[in-house]
Amino acid sequence: MLIRGMKGLGDCIYQRAFIRQLRGPVFLETPWPELYQDMPHVRCVRPATELRTQAKNIQRHAKWVRPPSGLGTLNIRYGGAGIYNGMRSAFRVQPGVLDLPGFGSPPVTGRYVLVRPVTVRAEWRADARNPLPEYIAAAAAEMRRRGYQVVSVADLQPGHEWALEPLPAADVRYHAGELPVEQLLALLQGAAAVIGGIGWVVPASIAAGVPAWVVCGGQGGYNAPELITDRAMKTSQLTFAVPDNFCRCTERQHTCDKRIANYDQRFAEWADRLPAVV
């Protein structure tokens, strides 16, 4: 079977739950073969992509497999019905466990929180989805006040991807894509908590079982919590901060109302539930 899979990092994490249910061999087009290293029935096929971070990871690898001719093909997509519901239809199976391979020791020691700043990509702008950057910055500052290290991760490049101010204060910054995906996910797996907006940190946090504070922005027609999570996932460690007037649009650029009342208090209550730094 040839699977023309989703290409985003987050989508490729979600896919794991379905691909593990398929009988092998499975020939999978993916920019992120690292995510399937613990699945011996998966053969990774080089995909075509023009997106910067995907192409950069593809260039790291040489051992791509050429699928045999005549294979049946599944094209994986999802729409407004939700990520897992769309994948159920595309894969034609129910999901298994959503997890990650073990990626070893993180590049940072001690008690730390992983923070994903708010960024904009020129090649795929999703301004409406982004939360207000001051909410991420406030959360990072509060965690530093509580004694945690803050580690901020991004892959910024002038003219291609940039962060929105205010940037979260951080003890360690990897903002130039220094971490390959294995180290990035090892960093997440070793974190005391994760803070960020909608994106790859959501499925990665669920898969790793790490507490996550996820700040929603807009574009709720695709990115509402109930659409990016599912009853089949273990989401007890996931907390969403949702705008009071959550916009259910499906536009990537729209002036959604992203304000959240009593945000600082709500975040402090969430942080109080984390184990104290000693």
Regions found by a protein language model. Give the residues of each.
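Catalytic machinery of carbohydrate-active enzymes
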Residues: M1-V278
